[in-house]
Amino acid sequence: MKPSQKRKVLVAAVAAVGLGLAGAGAGMSWAATTRTVKVGSAAQLKAALAAARPGDVITLAAGTYDGAFFGTASGTAAAPITLTGPKTAILSNTKNGCDPNVPSGRSVTYCGFGFHLNKANFWKLTGFSVKSANKGIVLDTVTHTVIDGVAVSGVRDEGIHFRTSSTDNVLRNSSVRDTGQGQPGFGEGVYIGSAKSNWAKFGSGANGADHSDRDTVTGNRIGPGVAAELIDIKEGTLNGTITGNTFDGTGVSGANSADSWIDAKGNNYKINSNKGTGPSGDLDGYQVHQQVASFGCGNVFSGNTSKLSSAGFAINVTDQSKCGTNLNVVGAGNTVTGAKSGLSNIKVTG
């Protein structure tokens, strides 16, 4: 081959490679490389979280990790970031350490959390425990994250909180107990959204609702020792699912109007196939309230089993008349024993 021909072949080959790379950049995504990062100390865990990238699996050795632990990187649907460990791997925050990544223009702090996800999507949190913190696990502006098989206990306030428009997340196969040890009225087991009084901090825009929508809570054991509601569904949230959970109301304090397993103030939740037991201190099993006009409506209760020792109802819907055509529904498949007022205060359907 003549030198001029060799040059033509080389130029053509380079051009072909360049076109291939350009095509990959335009229409393809490179697969993330899975890294397994083993950690055994608080310093190692902080470093792994700071360097996290899609596909990482951060594995906790047994032991106690004390400090402010938070994730700010996002995984992807194909390559989530995983934080995993045995129940004997315990995250705590005894010195009220802070995630410094706070949003500008809002008067909020992120201090004292056992674990915090902060604008970090597509995570998996599995297996480990959280104890001795102000709050257990908090998700702020997080989507498509799964919390699976974790254990939260012994915290000052709420156990697990989906907040600041955290959507499409799942809490499953986990346990939450002994919450509200510092502030019983704020010791919810699972907290979805924010009260209207906190929308300026955690809502969408100026005083807009906290749209922590379409979150699922399934197959968990919540209680005993949960001082406030076992699940608090806040006004402004929509279309969540609460299914297949076991509730033990022993320890509900009555502080800050906490007198039921679930307090539903959002819209269009499916609340089904849950089993609850409660002592005489629990007024009702489930309550529906309207804190904001048009909310506390369209919630459907089906297949729930309630065992109570109280003067109230299994399912008490307090503001049905304010819901217009988007009525709450209590199906005939719900059952109750021990509630002196019966199954529900509204008509049972089906």
Ranges and model annotations:
Residues 70, 98-116, 132-138, 154-163, ...:
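Extracellular beta-strand/beta-solenoid scaffold signature
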Residues 49-56, 74-76:
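Beta-strand repeat architectures
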Residues 1-31:
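Secretory targeting and sorting signals
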Residues 44-48:
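Short acidic active-site motifs
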Residues 56-59, 99-102, 188, 193-200, ...:
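Acidic, glycine- and Ser/Thr-rich low-complexity intrinsically disordered tracts
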Residues 80, 85-89, 121-132, 143-156, ...:
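Right-handed parallel beta-helix
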Residues 33, 38-40, 59-62, 67-68, ...:
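Right-handed parallel beta-helix/beta-spiral solenoid domain characteristic of secreted/periplasmic
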